[in-house]
């Protein structure tokens, strides 16, 4: 007897009340897309849990993929049997034998959801535990801190047996919180911000500012690779590549050096907001962390934000750099981010950028420029790629958007 299904437990979704079914259906669809290569699996869901019926598919690669699906609190390999004491004993024994149990400790934790079942939970614990002890060597009982917790749940449709919990990614299913535009550079911070935004249920579309010939095709490929890594957690993602050279040169030539960084960020935000309206998103996500660099002081953020009323979400705002780097390593974006290819944020860098810019001065300097047609041209000339986890870079859809 082998494990024939995977039991999935929801996390935060259990607090969603009347909207829970919306979250559960979205999670089911996200899992189905994630596991589309496993053609024989079936997904069954109910209000408080979900099952993946393996139907002969290998469980190891499925488990690895489930670890990256937001909305899953934990999951376990499971076996199902009839609501019969002997069947439950044999199923629990088979579940334990699937594990390296010698020299380990265990306990049985039974839960009788079906009150028509003739044995109480404590009786099940004793009967099943005694059977496992008799039929195995090198396994001992420890009811406080066991190595193996044999969980038995007797429900009306059958009894389910699990032995090991695997923690999921947590959060909410991607797509349940709406859509946002992620301002994605080639650095460490913004991919982590995108990951955390998706963890809160946001579908993201990435916006990258590309300034050839000052930035290379390798820098562009680096961003594509970062988006591909993020698709591990959020599924297919659109990447909007904005030609930014003309805008950046106009600012560099027309705005005093110490204010050029602020005006550049304001232009980026204007363009991202225009793309947001086009894509019907409701927010903008950035990788800003308060106080890290000159453009991320509170005074700078205030002046930069002035160009839009759109909500700006900053998932990293309370994190220090070491925390961000550690999370980047965990999600697999760090090694891509540190590749030595310049992006538009590292060219034309002012020698001494203002950390407390004056809004009136920014307005004055920008009023001397005719940026509006350049911004509109950048939006209209934006190239859009669709990046997919399984197939890599998708087709170009710039003409459709």
Swiss-Prot record:
Q: What pathway is this protein a component of?
A: Cofactor biosynthesis; thiamine diphosphate biosynthesis
EC no. given is: 2.8.1.4
Q: Name one GO biological process term.
A: thiamine diphosphate biosynthetic process
Ranges where the THUMP domain occurs: 60-165
Q: Which residues form a coiled coil?
A: none
Which residues make up the binding site for ATP?
A: 183-184, 208-209, 265, 287, 296
Predominant location = cytoplasm
Pfam families xrefs? ThiI (PF02568), ThiI_fer (PF22025), THUMP (PF02926)
**InterPro entries listed in its UniProt record:** Rossmann-like_a/b/a_fold, ThiI_AANH, ThiI_fer, ThiI_N, THUMP_dom, THUMP_ThiI, tRNA_STrfase, tRNA_sulfurtransferase_ThiI
Keyword Cell division included in the entry's annotation: no
Alphabetical keyword list: ATP-binding, Cytoplasm, Nucleotide-binding, RNA-binding, Thiamine biosynthesis, Transferase, tRNA-binding
Catalysed reactions, semicolon-separated? [ThiI sulfur-carrier protein]-S-sulfanyl-L-cysteine + a uridine in tRNA + 2 reduced [2Fe-2S]-[ferredoxin] + ATP + H(+) = [ThiI sulfur-carrier protein]-L-cysteine + a 4-thiouridine in tRNA + 2 oxidized [2Fe-2S]-[ferredoxin] + AMP + diphosphate; [ThiS sulfur-carrier protein]-C-terminal Gly-Gly-AMP + S-sulfanyl-L-cysteinyl-[cysteine desulfurase] + AH2 = [ThiS sulfur-carrier protein]-C-terminal-Gly-aminoethanethioate + L-cysteinyl-[cysteine desulfurase] + A + AMP + 2 H(+)
Per the record's keyword annotation, is Transmembrane included, yes or no? no
Cellular location(s): Cytoplasm
Per its record, what are the GO molecular function terms? ATP binding; CCA tRNA nucleotidyltransferase activity; tRNA binding; tRNA-uracil-4 sulfurtransferase activity
Q: Which SMART domains match?
A: THUMP
> What class does this enzyme belong to in the EC scheme?
transferase
UniProt GO cellular component terms: cytosol
What is stated as this protein's family in its record? Belongs to the ThiI family.
Function of the protein? Catalyzes the ATP-dependent transfer of a sulfur to tRNA to produce 4-thiouridine in position 8 of tRNAs, which functions as a near-UV photosensor. Also catalyzes the transfer of sulfur to the sulfur carrier protein ThiS, forming ThiS-thiocarboxylate. This is a step in the synthesis of thiazole, in the thiamine biosynthesis pathway. The sulfur is donated as persulfide by IscS.
Mind telling me what this protein is named? Probable tRNA sulfurtransferase
List the taxonomic lineage. Answer: Bacteria, Bacillati, Bacillota, Bacilli, Bacillales
Q: Which gene encodes it?
A: thiI
């Amino acid at each position: 007897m082998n494990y024939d299904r995977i039991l999935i437990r929801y996390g935060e979704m259990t607090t969603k009340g009347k909207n829970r079914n919306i979250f559960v259906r979205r999670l089911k669809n996200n899992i189905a897309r994630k596991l589309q290569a496993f053609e024989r699996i079936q997904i069954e869901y109910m209000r408080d849990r979900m099952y993946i019926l393996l139907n002969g598919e290998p469980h190891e690669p499925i488990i690895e993929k489930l670890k990256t699906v937001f909305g899953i609190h934990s999951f376990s390999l499971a076996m199902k049997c009839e609501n019969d004491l002997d069947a439950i004993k044999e199923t629990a024994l088979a579940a334990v034998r699937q594990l390296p149990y010698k020299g380990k400790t265990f306990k049985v934790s039974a839960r009788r959801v079906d009150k028509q079942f003739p044995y109480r939970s404590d009786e099940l614990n004793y009967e099943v535990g005694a059977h496992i002890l008799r039929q195995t060597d090198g396994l001992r009982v420890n009811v406080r801190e066991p190595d193996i917790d044999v969980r038995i749940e007797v429900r009306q449709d059958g009894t389910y047996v699990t032995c090991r919990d695997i923690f999921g990614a947590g959060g909410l299913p991607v797509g349940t919180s709406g859509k946002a535009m992620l301002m994605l550079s080639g650095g460490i911070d913004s991919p982590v911000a995108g990951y955390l935004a998706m963890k809160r249920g946001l579908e993201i579309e990435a916006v990258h500012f590309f300034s050839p010939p000052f930035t290379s095709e390798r820098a562009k490929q680096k961003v594509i690779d970062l988006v591909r890594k993020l698709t591990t957690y959020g599924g297919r993602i659109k990447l909007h590549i904005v030609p930014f050279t003309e805008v950046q040169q106009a600012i560099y030539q027309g705005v005093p050096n110490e204010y050029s960084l602020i005006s550049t960020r304001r232009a980026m935000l204007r363009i991202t907001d225009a793309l947001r309206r086009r894509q019907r998103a409701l927010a903008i996500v950035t990788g800003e962390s308060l106080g890290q660099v000159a453009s991320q002081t509170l005074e700078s953020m205030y002046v930069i934000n002035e160009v839009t009323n759109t909500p700006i979400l900053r998932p990293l705002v309370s994190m220090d750099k070491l925390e961000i780097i550690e999370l980047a390593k965990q999600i697999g974006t760090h090694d891509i981010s540190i590749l030595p290819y310049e992006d538009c944020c590292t060219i034309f860098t002012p020698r001494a950028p203002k950390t407390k810019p004056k809004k009136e001065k920014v307005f004055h300097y920008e009023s001397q420029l005719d940026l509006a047609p350049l911004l509109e041209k950048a939006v209209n000339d934006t190239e859009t790629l669709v990046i997919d986890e399984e197939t890599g870079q998708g087709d170009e859809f710039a003409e459709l958007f």
